[in-house]
Amino acid sequence: EGVAFLVRACGTSAFFSGDLNSWQWARPAEQNAASEKFFRTELSRIVPGPVDLAFVPLDPRLEDPAAGIAALMDVVGARALFPMHYWDASAAARALMSDARLAPYLGITHFEDVCELPDPVTPSA
């Protein structure tokens, strides 16, 4: 169990996915499908999209590590993307961005520990 947060403040929206994700583990396909459906249903509650900042798991241990970010961008969208939950596997996480579903978002994806975004971040509607 875990938490996820959507924060809107000062004209900027930030979504922290926390442990809410499309968890695609090595298990029966119907369990992974249920995880994907649940994640997309929860994401659909974020209206209006896109969010300005999104912090979403990109966990190399998963069978389909890109599923969560792909779902977020499909359902909600984000102006800046911050992968997380890759622990010490930064190189592996960066390599996962070559997934065809994620490649379009390379320009908005940030792996650095400190990131200065353009001022101001274009606020969401």
State where each predicted segment sits:
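Residue-level detector of structured alpha->beta connecting loops
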Residues: 50-52, 77
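Short linear motifs at secondary-structure transitions and domain/linker junctions
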Residues: 28-33, 56-58, 84
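Conserved Switch II/interswitch segment of TRAFAC-class P-loop GTPases
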Residues: 53-63
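Core dinuclear metal-dependent hydrolase active-site scaffold
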Residues: 1-50, 114-125
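Active-site metal-binding loops of divalent metal-dependent hydrolases
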Residues: 18-22, 58-60, 85-87
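Divalent metal-coordination and catalytic microenvironments
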Residues: 19, 54, 81
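A short, acidic, amphipathic alpha-helical segment used as a generic capping/interface helix at domain edges
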Residues: 38-44, 61-71
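Binuclear metal-ion centers of metallo-dependent hydrolases, dominated by the metallo-beta-lactamase
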Residues: 65-125
